[in-house]
Amino acid sequence: LNCHNQMSAQPPTTTRCSRWETNCYKKRWRDHRGYKTERGCGCPTVKKGIQLHCCTSDNCNN
């Protein structure tokens, strides 16, 4: 599985996930500087107020 792993508005980059990871994720939250986005492999647990999107196909988290 290949997932995007760039932060916020950085140019797109991807990473090859380990074979036991079956999801890509995109987390989005707001801080004092504006909205932040984090992407990567897996499907993490998030705190209240953080938007999370998990998906299972290559590069589905952009």
Curated annotation (Swiss-Prot):
Disulfide bonds join C3-C24, C17-C41, C43-C54, C55-C60. The keyword Secreted applies. It comes from the Eukaryota. Coiled coil: none annotated. The keyword Nucleotidyltransferase does not apply. GO terms for cellular component: extracellular region. Expressed by the venom gland. SUPFAM superfamilies: Snake toxin-like. GO terms for molecular function: acetylcholine receptor inhibitor activity; ion channel regulator activity; toxin activity. Binds to muscle nicotinic acetylcholine receptor (nAChR) and inhibit acetylcholine from binding to the receptor, thereby impairing neuromuscular transmission. Belongs to the three-finger toxin family. Short-chain subfamily. Type I alpha-neurotoxin sub-subfamily. This is Short neurotoxin 3. It comes from Naja mossambica (Mozambique spitting cobra).
